[in-house]
Amino acid sequence: MIFPIRCFSCGNVISEVYEEYRTRLKNGENPEEILNDLEIKKYCCRRMFASHRLDNDRELFDDIVEYK
């Protein structure tokens, strides 16, 4: 679905770095290094990035909207 604004567990704002994460991931960088550079330290916040589906630069939300 749509990337959450805050971490579900701790409530930290994580959406502010999502676009940079997505761009760097698309360029082939290692997800661990990206999260370290963006200073996403907590496991719960890192989980939010790792578990968010990105397939061919499309999010799950893009697929669902087609079936309105």
Swiss-Prot record:
EC number(s) from the headed UniProt entry: 2.7.7.6
Coiled-coil ranges per UniProt: none
Main localization category: cytoplasm
Gene symbol of the encoding locus: rpo10
Entry keyword set: Cytoplasm, DNA-directed RNA polymerase, Metal-binding, Nucleotidyltransferase, Transcription, Transferase, Zinc
SUPFAM superfamilies (alphabetical): RNA polymerase subunit RPB10
Pfam families documented for this protein: RNA_pol_N
GO molecular function ontology, one term from the record: zinc ion binding
Cited InterPro entries: RNA_pol_su_RPB10, RNA_pol_suN_Zn-BS, RPABC5/Rpb10
This protein's record includes keyword Protease: no
Organism: Methanococcus maripaludis (strain DSM 14266 / JCM 13030 / NBRC 101832 / S2 / LL)
HAMAP family from the UniProt entry: RNApol_arch_Rpo10
Annotated family: Belongs to the archaeal Rpo10/eukaryotic RPB10 RNA polymerase subunit family.
GO cellular component: cytoplasm; DNA-directed RNA polymerase complex
Protein name in the entry: DNA-directed RNA polymerase subunit Rpo10
